[in-house]
Amino acid sequence: MSNEGKCPVMHGGATSATQADNHWWPKALNLDILHQHDSKTNPMAPGFNYREALKGLDVEALKQDLKALMTDSQAWWPADWGHYGGLMIRMAWHSAGTYRIADGRGGGGHGAQRFAPLNSWPDNGNLDKARRLLWPIKQKYGNKVSWADLMILAGNMAYESMGLKTFGFAFGREDIWHPEKDTYWGAEKEWLAPSGGANSRYSGVRDLQNPLAAVMMGLIYVNPEGVDGNPDPLKTAQDMRVTFARMAMNDEETVALTAGGHTVGKAHGNGNAANLGPEPEAAPLEEQGFGWMNHQSRGIGRNTVTSGIEGAWTTHPTRWDNGYFHLLFSYDWALTKSPAGAWQWEPVNIREEDKPVDVEDPNIRSNPMMTDADMALKMDPDYRRIAERFFHDPDYFADTFARAWFKLTHRDMGPKSRYFGPDVPAEDLIWQDPVPKGNSQYDPEAVKARIAGTGLGAAELVATAWDSARTYRNSDKRGGANGARIRLLPQKDWVANEPARLARVLELLTPIASDMGVSIADTLVLGGNLGVELAAKAAGFNIKVPFIPGRGDASQAQTDIDSFEVLEPLADGFRNWQKQDFVVTPEEMLLDRAQLMGLSAPEMTVLIGGMRAMAVNHGGTTHGVLTDNPGSLSNDFFVNLTDMSYRWKPVANNLYEICDRASGQKKWTATRVDLVFGSNSVLRAYAEYYAQDDNKETFVKDFVTAWCKVMNADRFDA
């Protein structure tokens, strides 16, 4: 009989691994992505403002502490050649490098590398040691610097300590306090699963699933040993081109980042990978958050195993120079295997003086190595052309890399108005989506009065303002109404924006903006606010929608068309529209859009109800307009959705009829997006709340609050 006592408190399954509801009902809508990062998980005091805390940070002292850290080798994890620069750069790189442009998720903007799954990805091996080395500095400066900022700054200071003039640095990344639930990393069930297997991210002829950028589960970029671990630099080059493009990088930036990242530091594979313990999330308690511990052999210094590849890329791995290209182009390279059994390339007949010295003993020299990705820069014709230019023009290489590194580490921070600190570059860069400062000294009511005289209906005004604002992504802080880019390419031609209607509205509102010295961006939002006020009045409520002036108008020259193409809505459940049928259900696409817009489940619910009541569907369809008084900001959508005198029946793909139970007569039509608010138990609870007789005014007020949140989501300048 076991001496182990039975659980005296809640059953173990409630506090550890358990069968979640979506295990029993895998097709059920998972609202968890809207219920994360709230005050209950955040230990900071209510009202804590990171930007205000940053004002008390001694930036120069912090930078000097980081520089000192680089050469303060610790016995528990010795620095290669007495310098932690390579390790810190890899930590920063892998923090920022998870960003993908398709949905703006990933990246280093929230310090997510501290949590699962990223903290335990194979590609992040031993970065737990880098963060632990930073802990005394984080402890010292406390709330004045976030982990997210500190990890990226550590990479910057590592480069500066080794001789690179960096392009700049901006503070402003706020930490999260638990793993992100909204980021899709792939469907594979095993680390580093090769393509073509079950749940593969590839289909067809190596067609990588959107929105993914990395080639394997658990990798940041490409496989350094080759496609699926099979060396072939030309095939690897194609993977690199896709992966880096999905991170918003062109060929020149790809070559610069690869070469600049490998100019310093080394890879580690001098040992037996089988001796490594489990990753941090699976490690025993006594490891205290450390993973990949080697208790079978020495496992540190020259005997460290991380990727399995072994060696430095350059002769002098602790200084910034052009040595990477010197070795790449001066020697022929032969395929071999590391002591840990990983594929790598080593030079043929290399001169002794070109070999890097051992990390512990300067009297020992070893061959440098190149990964399959490095060899791709030599063998792919387009990459080689760029690499040769860098080889012959070191200053151009250094500047190009510094700019690409800045882009890599700041791409997910959004507009420049979010940047903070003394090292923010003065230069505006097109990938920052610059917006000129707008006028805020005017009477919004006078502008609304002019708009009211145009004859535009409330639905047209609301739809146009919504379309302008809905592109905002809280993931990378891109998009939104500021800039009025809805009037520019590519947005003005998007099917989602109903180009003909949009052109008509802009034709009437643009002269008003010009006459009154107001931005078109502000004018569009004011028009939407006016439409909401008119709809509320029709429902019997006199309200004034709050407004914050000062938006600017971006120019076409300030707008990277290709970069903005990824913001095109393929579906918008709030306007009951999708461009085509997708494998993903319409309600899942609604949930994804709501999460990207930074909405909670109640906010998503009240917005759907209000948009349906005001009849602002795309193309003027009446699906889901469950009211006899369209255009009125009433709670009729919820009242009729929850009314048991009606029954619902499917009549076509994504189309349902609402019929009177007694007569069988059709009353309305609706889509899956509409019906999910009566079907999903959580959303139905919200729908019933807003359908209550005593919540008619609450519904209007909550709609206005959520509407303003959408209109102002990108106002980091306000």
Swiss-Prot record:
Which residue numbers mark the cross-link Tryptophyl-tyrosyl-methioninium (Trp-Tyr) (with M-247) in this sequence? W93-Y221
Protein name stated in the entry: Catalase-peroxidase 1
Q: Does the keyword rRNA processing apply?
A: no
CDD domains found in the cross-reference section: catalase_peroxidase_1, catalase_peroxidase_2
PTM statement from Swiss-Prot or TrEMBL: Formation of the three residue Trp-Tyr-Met cross-link is important for the catalase, but not the peroxidase activity of the enzyme.
In the record, biological process GO terms are: cellular response to hydrogen peroxide; hydrogen peroxide catabolic process
UniProt-listed Gene3D superfamilies: 1.10.520.10, Peroxidase, domain 2
Which positions hold the covalent cross-link Tryptophyl-tyrosyl-methioninium (Tyr-Met) (with W-93)? Y221-M247
- What EC number(s) has UniProt assigned to this enzyme? 1.11.1.21
Q: Where does heme b bind?
A: H262
Q: Which PROSITE patterns match?
A: PEROXIDASE_2, PEROXIDASE_4
What does this protein need as cofactor?
heme b
Q: Which UniProt keywords apply?
A: Heme, Hydrogen peroxide, Iron, Metal-binding, Oxidoreductase, Peroxidase
